[in-house]
């Protein structure tokens, strides 16, 4: 079986997401929607990069591979969001941070739920594709 090539848009999309994240770090904006969107974009792009590392995924069946990638995206979204929340709070020298420790820990506590949701969504997509 031949190795699938990376799409041409993957590297520019990754670069654009990084630029948007750095611009977001400089702004005075602290909504959870934006940090989850950036975290989700980063996790999805990371999963796409990992999916094209063919030797890593070739030994898994298609359904298991989709579930693992879904779990990676779900859990990675929360991990990336918490990391971005920490970076934004650490880089801004405010008396009161953009995100509190309670918000960051609350977000991290949702990691198993988001990973499970990603696994279920990945499995569902795999079932629809197999028809």
Where are the language model's segments positioned?
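Juxtamembrane/disordered regions of integral membrane proteins
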Residues: 1-131
């Amino acid at each position: 079986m031949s190795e699938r090539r990376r799409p041409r848009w993957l590297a520019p999309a990754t670069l654009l997401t990084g630029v948007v994240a750095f611009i977001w770090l400089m702004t005075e904006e602290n909504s959870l929607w934006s940090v989850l969107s950036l975290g989700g974009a980063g996790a999805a792009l990371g999963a796409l990069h990992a999916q094209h590392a063919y030797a890593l995924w070739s030994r898994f069946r298609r359904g298991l591979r989709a579930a693992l990638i879904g779990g990676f995206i779900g859990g990675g979204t929360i991990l990336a969001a918490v990391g971005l929340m920490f970076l934004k709070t650490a880089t801004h020298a405010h008396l009161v941070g953009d995100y509190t420790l309670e918000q960051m820990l609350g977000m991290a506590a949702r990691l198993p739920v988001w990973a499970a949701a990603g696994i279920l969504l990945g499995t569902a997509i795999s079932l629809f594709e197999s028809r």
